[in-house]
Each structure stands twice: as structure tokens, then as C-alpha cells.
């Protein structure tokens, strides 16, 4: 029996139902195919879905590539992903968050690939067997910090001077920044000049410099060069930055820090005027009082000299020390020695960080007429008891001997940090603000 439907058209011709069904099926198939094509095109334009749906390459293909090439490829992919995020410093509290372990993280450099790292910070080269400290990533609670992009950094620095001013911790941040960007600059297009106090890395292609000026107190002292090892003999000239500030003038970006040199546990010998008479005229002051006077002198220089329309000013908060393992519940431990993981307790605050000193910084900056951006590294660094140089460092220009490493109570450095390492995160935050 054939099923026919009447044709309402001219001539009254009838069309078999089977043909109509076949035509409708073909039409629906075409619609589905077209829709799927549009869907595929849409998904390919979305970096978030396309990257996360990529299948991993076969292991043999990955292992056959040079590590530096793999590191570069991963960095480029992550840069594309991070383009989806906009960092708003007004909305993002970088101090509140947690360290997340990510086994896929590869540093943008190593202490062997970057020739500018002091041996003091070259933990891997100095025999550090652990690498997990390189795999922790800082994740704020309410925002995302873009990954460090060397190309973006150098484009932002094109035609500019970036100058770090401060102590050896600030020097490690400077070395970190240089190492993060130097690999994208051709060999003949970069140079490094070092003196006792002043260090300049130049990227000719970008007409940019990344500089460091050694000033552990920011204000002048009798222990800059040469360093006086006995804290009792150190004198701080709390009323002047004149001699050193001439090196700072004209910089487009200034990043200051000063803290650990003030924390000797002794009262500070403060001087007004000339060093010509030695300790004569020096007055012993409480640390916080001397610190405030020194920072006010710095603030006065910034307010009177820096043109905020041309120069941006940053201040990095104190880098914590971890010399008392009882702080994190290990009374029988040996400072930061043999620590392999960050502290998880978000409320942790060790004895190596002085909140009153932090309040001094906040108070001084609050009353400045020039805007100063504070890079708060303290809380996130508090958790990183695992990232110090520990016994994988040098002292007196020499790598620690086996005997010295076996005595971490006297030789473990729980003040400075390995490179690559934690200072890379500081620079990730700095770049996000630029």
C-alpha cells in the first residue's frame, strides 16, 4: 500500500511521502552539519577551551626537544592563556592567598642558563638536591596574577630605566628580573656593567636598562662599602641620601626596599651631619625611631625630586627571615634547614617579621605627596620556609664546605632566597603593576 499526500498546488499532482521524508532528513542533516561547523569555529577562537582541550604530545616527542625550547613553548602558551585576565591592583589583594603545587611549572631560567646570578643565590649549582621549591605558585584568593612575560616586560621598559635600590634581598630581586628577560635578548644586544655599588644591565634593542644600586639603609651609612661586619660599629646618617641619590635621578621606575639591616637587635647609632668625626655626635636610637627618620629623609627626597608624571615609585615590604623553627611548630628543628614545603597556615606570622616596622613604612608613605605603590611581599613570603638558600650558598666568597653544611645551626642562610625561586614571584607582582 502506498502512502500519498494530496498536493495543494497546480494540477493536483501527488508526491510520495517517502520522497518528502527523504528530503526532510537530508535538510536536517545539512543543518546539523552547519551548526557543528559553527561550534567548532567558535571554540577555536576561545583560548581557554582550545588550550585546555589539547591532547598532550607523546612522551618521546617531548623528551627529544631541548629543555630550553620546551620551557619557551610552555611560557608562550601560558602567556596566551594569561591574556584573558586583567589585573586590577585596586581589586586584587596579592597578600591574601595560598601556595599551590604545580608539577608542570618550569622556571624561565636556571642558575646555569642565566650568567648574572651571584653564587650566593645559586642553590642548584651549589648542590641543592630538591627541586620542589620551584614548583609552588602563588594564588591570591580573589584574583589572578598574570604570569611573567619577558616580551611584555621589555616592551613596557622600552626606552626606560628600571632601578632597584636597597640591600642584598633587593639585589636578588634585580637579578631575578634580569634573568627573567635576558633570554629573549640576542647575545650581541645585551651587556652588564658592575661596580661596587652600581650595576647596570642594558638591552640595546629596547634602549632599556635594568639597574641596581646598593643602599642597605637607603639613607647613607658608614657600612655600605666596605661592609662593617660588627653591627655595634655601624652608623646611619639618617638625614641624608644626597651622595647616592644622584644615581637615582632620571629613572623611570624606582623600586626601593630596606629592612633587614635595621634588625640587628641593637639600638641604632644615628648621625646628623658629617661622618668626619667618626662616632662623635652619633646618638643611639630605638630601631623604629631611627627607621622612621631614615624613611622620612627618603620620602622628602622623593617628594622634592621625583616628577610623578615621568617616574613611578615602588616600595617593597620586608622580606621575612626564618631562623626560629619553633615559630612553625618545630622546636627541635634547625632554622629553615631541610624544610621542603611552604607553611599552610594562612595566619602564620613568624618572629622574623616586625609588624611595627611595617606600620612605620605605611605611616611614612601615607603622608607623602608623591604616590608610592607598595609591593606587599611579606605575607606570601612568610610561608616559604622551603625556599631559602639554607646551606646551599657561599660565605666569604667561598661555597660552604661539607663540614659547614653539616652544621646548619651556624651556617644555614635563612634570610636570602634561591634563584630561580621566590623573588620571581615578587617580580611577577611588580610587572602586573607596571
UniProtKB/Swiss-Prot annotation:
Localization per record: Golgi apparatus membrane
Keywords: Golgi apparatus, Membrane, Signal-anchor, Transmembrane, Transmembrane helix
GO molecular function: xylan O-acetyltransferase activity
Main subcellular localisation: Golgi
Short motif (GDS motif): ranges: 166-168
Motif (DCXHWCLPGXXDXWN motif): 413-427
Any further remark recorded for this protein: Contains 2 motifs that are conserved in esterases, but it is unlikely that this protein belongs to the catalytically active pectin esterases.
Family: Belongs to the PC-esterase family. TBL subfamily.
PANTHER family in UniProt: PROTEIN TRICHOME BIREFRINGENCE-LIKE 3, PROTEIN TRICHOME BIREFRINGENCE-LIKE 9-RELATED
Full protein name: Protein trichome birefringence-like 3
Source organism: Arabidopsis thaliana (Mouse-ear cress)
